[in-house]
Regions:
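Acidic, metal-coordinating catalytic segment for phosphate/diphosphate chemistry
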Residues: 1-23, 95
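Long, hydrophobic N-terminal alpha-helical segment
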Residues: 14-55, 60
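Nudix hydrolase/Nudix homology domain
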Residues: 41, 113-177
């Protein structure tokens, strides 16, 4: 499945910042493993490096962010989101016309302890934390107001992805205790 989010009707010729990302949907007891900073919620994952395929990129990102070893065989492609945003405000305050192509995978929960994950210096600097997000919390974050201008970009995509996941009952069988 592919979803295009483009509220400003940007065309590719107007895009000044493009990246390819991967993220993992990891469900634990009806909630989802997420990272949070400055009112932004993200599923674990990140940018695909040059020459890296999508599955291997997610294996690397999950090891970096959660300290857990996964293999490509443990990931099920779920949904691709192509998200455009006009005048996206970067961390440095500059504005870009952004296009992010993100592939989301369903990944089994492997029993790791979120409190035991070691955060990087950069993550600690930005107040990053790991936690669980319930479907009730998911509804609430879409209503939150925030001083962070990037919040809407990330949280709206998270909402679309997880609501699609929750509507697919057959995907709920991958959790491992």
């Amino acid at each position: 499945m592919e979803i295009i989010m483009n509220k400003d009707n940007l065309i590719d010729e107007e895009v000044t910042d493009f990246s390819i990302k991967v993220r993992g949907i990891i469900e634990k007891d009806g909630s989802f493993v997420v990272g949070k900073y400055d009112d932004v919620y993200l599923l674990p994952g990140g940018k695909v490096e040059e020459g890296e395929d999508l599955s291997n990129a997610l294996v690397r990102e999950l090891k970096e962010e959660l300290g857990v070893d996964y293999s490509c065989e443990e990931m099920i492609p779920f949904i691709r989101v192509i998200h455009y945003d006009k005048d996206y405000i970067k961390r440095d305050g500059s504005k870009v016309n952004r296009k992010v192509d993100t592939m989301y995978f369903i990944v089994s929960y492997k029993g790791f302890d979120l409190d035991e994950v070691t955060l990087s210096e950069s993550e600690r600097k930005y107040g990053f934390s790991l936690g669980l997000l319930s479907s009730v919390d998911l509804e609430e974050i879409s209503k939150m107001s925030s001083a962070n201008p990037r919040r809407e970009f990330f949280n709206s995509e998270l909402s679309v992805v997880l609501n699609n996941y929750l509507s697919k009952e057959s995907y709920k069988v991958f959790e491992k205790k």
